[in-house]
Amino acid sequence: MSRNKIVQDTDSDALLSKFAAERAGYYHDPLLKLFLPSNIDPAHVHKLPLFNRGTYVRVMAVSKLIDQFLETTSDTKKQIISLGAGSDTRPFYLLPKYRSNLMYHELDFAVSARQKAELVAKHAVLKDAIPGPVEYDIHTPDLPHRPRRRSSPRLFVPSREQASQSGSGPHHLHPSSGINTHPRHNSPSPAQNPHGFETPLKSPSYYIHGVDLRHLMTPASVQLPGIDFSLPTLLVSECCLCYLEPDASDAVLAAFIKAFTSPSSSNQLGIVSYEPFSSDDQFGRVMIHNLATRGISIPTMMAFPTLQAQVSRLRGLGFKAAAAGNLKYVHDAWINGDEMQKIDALELLDEREEFDLLVAHYGIYWGSTVPESDSSDYKFEGPFGGWIDFPRQI
């Protein structure tokens, strides 16, 4: 199996993890069910309590940072660019809420982008969430779609014993049926589109782009259809850029930073990222080994083994304000007493020590190109000003 296919397949486990946590009552996301593979019985999707709580903390933290970005100066139109969006349901909740004040772009491998566009076309509840007319450009490439097979987790890496308890059998994610595919019309010529990106869905406020992120390494290459460089913009990378080699990952971020800090742009770019890190300890090394046995490599785990290394990386790339916290810190510092009582009542967490150790190896990172000066590493301003209220570990 190719490395690209292995990385694409990790979205299946992320989806099942989110659905299991939703089904256990940690949050409400009824749209997740629409993305489940047809051969999966929703009633049989279960995860251990420590995984459900970890998924909840990850979803909660990313959502809070995104919501705060959108609510700060809420009368200003903003833009979200989600890298490796996969089966994320977030746009179908945010677009109806913010409508003309939000432009939302999702980038993923072409096959994943195509599958999501097909799913939107199939389900009215998804299509109706998108303001304005929706255009589809779903074509059949030379190679037909193949079922997506569940591989290794995008979220958590259990121990061998925990993996054996969680029922990690194969799961297939079939592309949606009943959608007429057709050749692309009005598509860029090969000379205009040397990297073969495609846009299987577009609307006045929502685009799905099929593109290999490794081709987005220059300011010109990130100028995909519909991206507005004059808008305050948030990059979202949930376990996405970590699959690239560090130099490639840095180049992608640098390309977006340069594009958004040019004289004609907004100079207002932020990032919210979720990635594992090794902590350069035994548990981190076991995580890396377990991933390797499944064909998965996450190069950034060793290249940036600590929260401080990731924050220094963001600042070095041009995010003048940057902060971070591991999921254990976020769990303890961001969840208020009432919410903690609620989630404590959902499931008995016998494995608290294991939970703390596990989530301490996953980090949430946030940063922005605002302010322009380097006077403070935590001086969030403008559309990112609300982030100053979030407790930070680094």
Q: Which ranges hold each PLM region?
A:
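Rossmann-like AdoMet
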Residues: 1-209, 216-217, 223-225, 229, ...
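Short secondary-structure boundary/capping segments
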Residues: 97-98, 251-253, 286-291
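Rossmann-like AdoMet/SAM-dependent catalytic core
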Residues: 150-153, 160-168, 174-182, 282-394
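General small-molecule cofactor/ligand-binding pocket signal
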Residues: 207-209, 272, 322-325
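Short, conserved secondary-structure transition motifs
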Residues: 214-215, 276-285
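A short, conserved alpha-helix within the catalytic core of class I
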Residues: 214-221, 242-260
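A short SAM/SAH-binding and catalytic strip from SAM-dependent methyltransferases
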Residues: 231-247
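Conserved beta-strand signature within the Rossmann-like core of class I S-adenosyl-L-methionine
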Residues: 233-237, 259-280
